[in-house]
Amino acid sequence: MKIFNWVHKRLHQRVVKDGFAGNVKKSELETNDKDTQAFLKQVGLVNVDGLDGWRDGILTIGTFGFDPLKPSTHQNEYFVLESEEDDQESHGFSHSGNDDDDDDDEHYDHSVEDEELNPLMFTTFEHSFEDIGSNFDAIVQKPADVILTVDGVPLTPFEGSSEISTKPDQSANDQSKNKKGQRITLADLFQADVPDVGQLKLDSGKVQPEMEKKMNARTRSGLAFAKKLIPRVKDDSSPIKNMQRLMRRMLKRKIHPAELEVKIHKSDGQKQPSAVELISNVENDAYESVSLLPIQGAPCVH
């Protein structure tokens, strides 16, 4: 695991401070050289010429030096120097300051620790926090006769509070009705959506006569609209079918007028006359009209 620890140290190079720059750099270089030599001796590649150029940059693939068998102190070796420097700085500040300042700092640290809750501790000791809160509420209770005021004006309790509500809740009544076996129908739901719900009375899920009158008025108005479109429709039970028939006829006349004419003539048993026949008929009619005129010297036929 030395190679992994070495790579981990190289990855986490800390920022060196002013007073300890030279000593820390020397110690790091010495430890890195020792680790590389130990690794190369263990592998047996010390005398290989190919490794001379990249001994300091050996590529490693692994868990980056986290060994579960080792204690946590060995895993966090690269934090030792930082912790020592922080301790020295804190001691230096404490010697330079007064005793009162030390007391204030300690008090401030304790207050900050009290304010910030560790999430792990909160999850593990959540039941104890709840017990403390319940005991505190039991000790500090609001007396029954206290009246809350704002600038001398008493506050009225909100609707639905325990102080105002003396009658049983409507939800409790609904639950009791459901338990008795009464069903809620669609009529009840529709009546609940009506704006004047206060005027209507719910009678065991039955439709009220006022609602029936409103529905009848709506259906009559719909039939009146159909009568305006189709004047022949009076009290016919199927205005939609008649409308569909009318639309079919209109479409046939607009799209295929020739076919309709042919069908009409076939139904009458007559053929459509051609242009020549029409002209000949006109000439014959003219001759007949001329022959009927009186002629001088011709005998009159009685």
UniProtKB/Swiss-Prot annotation:
Q: Where is region (Disordered) located? A: 82-115, 159-180
Tell me one GO biological process term: morphogenesis of a branching structure
Q: Where is the composition biased (Acidic residues)?
A: 99-115
According to its UniProt record, in which tissues is this protein expressed? Highly expressed in flower buds. Expressed in branch attachment sites, vegetative buds and young fruits.
Q: Bias category Polar residues: which stretches? A: 162-175
Where, by residue number, is the motif IGT motif?
57-63
Q: What happens when the gene is disrupted?
A: Pillar tree (erect shoot growth) phenotype.
Query: Which UniProt keyword terms apply here?
Result: Growth regulation
Purpose:
Involved in the regulation of axillary shoot growth angle. Promotes horizontal shoot growth.
Name the protein family: Belongs to the TAC family.
Query: What name has this protein been given in UniProt?
Result: Protein TILLER ANGLE CONTROL 1
Q: Which organism is it from?
A: Prunus persica
